[in-house]
Amino acid sequence: ACPQKRGVCTRVYTTTPKKPNSALRKVCKVRLTNGFEVISYIGGEGHNLQEHSVVLIRGGRVKDLPGVRYHTVRGTLDTAGVKDRKQARSKYGAKRPK
């Protein structure tokens, strides 16, 4: 397979995790370049994705969201990095703060 894959967001929405957790998790439906349509999780606080955004996705499921088997990669293509992120920055596409 591929380590990452490019795709276009067809729907950006929130879902609720399964018990015993409770939250509004940000996810997006992505139509990949190979024609697959998958659901991808958007990690980090806040995001700028909307319909027709071009995103890069990587593997990695979200254990409390059924059917979500991919993560969007922050800080590439149309996905902005997380603002004011101080720790674990490379995972969220944040530059080193001055």
UniProtKB/Swiss-Prot annotation:
This is Small ribosomal subunit protein uS12. Disulfide bonds: none annotated. PANTHER family: 30S RIBOSOMAL PROTEIN S12 FAMILY MEMBER. CDD domains: Ribosomal_S12. The gene is rpsL. It comes from the Bacteria. Keywords: Methylation, Ribonucleoprotein, Ribosomal protein, RNA-binding, rRNA-binding, tRNA-binding. GO terms for biological process: translation. GO terms for molecular function: rRNA binding; structural constituent of ribosome; tRNA binding. InterPro entries: NA-bd_OB-fold, Ribosomal_uS12, Ribosomal_uS12_bac. It holds the Pfam family Ribosom_S12_S23. Belongs to the universal ribosomal protein uS12 family. The modification 3-methylthioaspartic acid is found at D64. Residues 79-98 are annotated as: Disordered. It comes from Eikenella corrodens. One of its GO terms (cellular component) is small ribosomal subunit. Part of the 30S ribosomal subunit. Contacts proteins S8 and S17. May interact with IF1 in the 30S initiation complex. With S4 and S5 plays an important role in translational accuracy. Interacts with and stabilizes bases of the 16S rRNA that are involved in tRNA selection in the A site and with the mRNA backbone. Located at the interface of the 30S and 50S subunits, it traverses the body of the 30S subunit contacting proteins on the other side and probably holding the rRNA structure together. The combined cluster of proteins S8, S12 and S17 appears to hold together the shoulder and platform of the 30S subunit.
